[in-house]
A protein has these predicted regions:
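A structural motif specific to WD40 beta-propellers
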Residues: 70, 113-117, 154-158, 212-213, ...
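Repeat-blade elements of multi-bladed beta-propeller folds
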Residues: 39-47, 81-103, 122-145, 168-194, ...
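Bacterial signal peptide processing site
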Residues: 29-31
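Blade/loop signatures of beta-propeller domains
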Residues: 34-70, 405, 411
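C-terminal motif of bacterial Sec signal peptides marking the signal peptidase cleavage site
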Residues: 24-27
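Conserved blade-ending motifs and adjacent loop-strand segments that build the rim/top face
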Residues: 298-299, 348-350, 357-365, 431-438, ...
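Surface-exposed loop and turn segments in beta-propeller and other repeat-based domains
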Residues: 72-78, 120-123, 160-164, 214-228, ...
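Short loop/turn segments that connect beta-strands within beta-propeller blades
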Residues: 108-111, 149-152, 206-208, 283-285, ...
Length: 510
């Protein structure tokens, strides 16, 4: 994933988003039982450890139109990517939120009053955010993982994870069974893909921060050229099943696709494993169980970065992933073999270009416009109600010359696409006038989605009918969080002059 060649407002969408809530996944053999998920997943990004984003609350299709603003809280952090790009977690009536300066706040859900704040003032491109577990709030800055006391915000430990100057951290951690999971990525806030960066997933002891094991998502040899190559890494919190496995998606290889020096990725021959992949490991040891690569030898920054959604459909345990190639893939969770694939959004036939370049057949790649572009496809996490998958889509192109150089694309628009989890067929879609950089969230028979220009939409999960729209005071590039009768929407980036980012709490009846 790269931030080069795009204006500031568009860059924010590259900071992938996570959303957080409290819910259990019912009827999912691949993940934990519903009861276990509710306890283990409390405060987990993606709602639960299966990353279903299926929240518990009193909001449904009969009353969602009664949502009104209850309170607001200014977002004052400063970075090149706005003030905020992650959804807070909500645990026992307290919101835990991290801004794009890496600062963490605990906020009273009822009143919006700040209970405590931990300042780091370390600008981050995002997505970042926190996970709450075992009395601690776990998070990251651009170079360390840390644990804070859940009640006071006092730092318990901090662990340096970077192995070189070409690496950074841009994710909310995962937490499971006494371990915290954090990945580096081969890019920094100041220099995208400087070369030599290896995306590495670390498992840390939750009590001490001590490193237990690590998994290199790409080889340290970097396919033969450690000066300019790099790649992989995890941008989103991983998922876990009840068999002790961890699932995650990975980023693209570098150099950045389309650079004049290496337009077809000549410096990194081969498929560039394990980039653009879903990977399953033993969570206790880091042992590789299987991998699936969606885009070998990626040329277009088509990360397969979404957190896998774990569920059961038609008696089969599935791990459903997606990324910037704009293809949703359901894999058999036991074997990693594809069950179905569903392209979403706009495509125009460049899916095999990486394979052509890998075979030395670059002349067969057609110059012109490429869909999805570098800011297109599925950028944000998906959600599910157990039978339908809700996919946020960004439609936007890039251009490619006959010599392999990439250029800027055009305007971005968005969609929310509902896919039957069993068959992979599209049930309905809703189009937005701006990009869908935020993850959808399900609560009962309602799915809540956001559009970059500052809108929050509620749709009926079965029909796709629009039920409610909220207008925010600034742009939003993340999903909402839901608890009880309240929706928390971080409007984290000014998209027009005079706008001021702030968190808006919507509540039934105001």
């Amino acid at each position: 994933m790269s931030l080069e060649k795009f204006p500031q407002a568009a860059w924010v969408g590259m900071g992938l988003v996570v959303a957080v809530l409290l819910a259990a996944l019912s009827g999912c053999g691949s993940s934990s039982s519903g009861e276990d998920l509710e306890s283990a997943g409390s405060g987990y990004p993606g709602v639960d450890i299966a990353n279903t984003r299926n929240a518990k609350g009193s909001i449904d299709s009969s009353n969602v139109a009664e949502l009104e603003p209850a309170w607001t809280l200014p977002l004052t952090a400063e970075s090149n990517y706005g003030a905020h790009s992650s959804s807070p977690v909500i645990v026992n009536g307290v919101i835990y939120s991290q801004d794009l300066a890496s600062n963490v706040q605990a906020i009273d859900l009822e009143s919006g009053e700040v209970k405590w704040s931990r300042e780091y003032e370390d600008p981050n491109e995002g997505p970042n955010g926190v996970v709450v577990g075992d009395g601690s709030v776990f998070g990251t800055t651009s170079d360390v993982a840390f644990a804070l006391d859940q009640e006071t915000g006092k730092e318990i430990w901090s662990t340096e994870l970077l192995q070189g100057s070409g690496e950074g951290i841009d994710m909310a951690p995962g937490y499971r069974d006494g371990l915290v999971f954090v990945s580096t990525v081969p890019t920094t806030v100041s220099v995208p893909y400087p070369g030599g960066g290896v995306g590495t997933l670390w498992a840390l002891d939750a009590k001490t921060g001590k490193k237990k094991w690590h998994f290199d998502t790409v080889p340290k040899s970097l396919w033969g050229d450690t000066r300019i190559n790099g790649g992989g890494g995890v941008w989103q919190p991983p998922s876990f099943d009840d068999q002790g496995a961890i699932y995650f998606g990975t980023g693209n290889p570098a150099p950045y696709p389309g650079t004049p020096q290496e337009p077809w990725g000549e410096s990194r021959p081969g498929p560039n494993l394990y980039t653009n992949s879903m990977v399953k490991l033993d969570a206790r040891t880091g042992k590789l169980l299987w991998h699936y690569q969606q885009t070998p030898h990626d040329l277009y920054d088509w990360d397969f970065q979404d957190p896998p959604v774990l569920l059961s459909a038609d008696g089969r345990d599935l791990a459903i992933g997606a990324g910037k190639s704009g293809v949703v893939v359901a894999l058999d969770a036991k074997t990693g073999k594809p069950v179905w694939k569903r392209p979403v959004g706009t495509h125009n036939g460049h899916e095999e270009d990486g394979l052509l370049a890998m075979r030395g057949e670059e002349s067969k790649i057609k110059p012109g416009t490429v869909y999805p572009g570098t800011l297109g496809g599925v950028i944000a996490p998906m959600a599910t109600d157990g039978s339908m998958i809700f996919v946020p889509v960004v439609n936007g192109p890039l251009t490619i010359s006959a010599s392999g150089e990439l250029g800027e694309g055009g305007e971005l628009s968005g969609e929310l696409v509902a896919i039957d989890a069993k068959s992979g067929k599209v049930a309905w879609n809703q189009e937005f006038s701006s990009a869908a950089f935020g993850a959808p969230t399900v609560v009962n028979d309602v799915v809540i989605a956001t559009a970059f220009e500052g809108s929050v939409f509620a749709f009926d999960t079965e029909s796709g009918n629009e039920l409610w729209v909220g207008t925010l005071p600034a742009g939003i590039n993340t999903g909402v969080s839901v608890s009880g009768d309240t929706v928390i929407a971080p409007a984290g980036i000014a998209t027009a002059e005079g706008q001021a980012p702030e968190i808006v709490a919507y509540r039934l009846g105001g």
